[in-house]
Amino acid sequence: RGLGDVYKRQAYAQYFTGESFFNPLTDPTKTVFLANVTFSPACRNNWHIHHAKSGGGQLLLCMDGLGWYQEAGKSAQALHPGDVVTIPAGVKHWHGAQKDCWFSHIAIECPGEETSNEWLEPVTDAEYAALDADCAQNP
């Protein structure tokens, strides 16, 4: 199974605005889980938190297209191929594609003790639309 063997991410569709695709690259029951996640234009996941008693968190390796990453209380960060995002456990955040671009990243779940994911509210259309205005003013 390579990066091109993707399928519709139906199990998690309730946590996404728009259409996304999910391709596990490793066995989720093993020590480190990697998956290729592809977002259609304007698709994004809900705010969420990766919890862990110790360790945990997530790494995003940006592969193709243009995306967004935002932590609660901070400005959104534009993502480009080759960018790496380190997300510590306990940080509320979201990520997804820019308005007119597909976006793909490799998501790596960092090993930890008592890890879990908490899915929260969607990123609203108004919040998302404001990103383009911010990006246009601050390229």
What positions do the PLM features span?
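Conserved hydrophobic/aromatic beta-strand scaffold that supports enzyme active sites
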Residues: 22-24, 34-38, 59, 76, ...
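Acidic/histidine-enriched, glycine/proline-rich intrinsically disordered or flexible terminal extensions
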Residues: 114-139
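Ligand-binding loop in jelly-roll beta-barrel domains
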Residues: 68, 89-117
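Conserved metal-binding segment of the jelly-roll/cupin
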Residues: 39-42, 79-100
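Short strand-connecting beta-turns/loops that link adjacent beta-strands
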Residues: 30, 54, 74, 100-101, ...
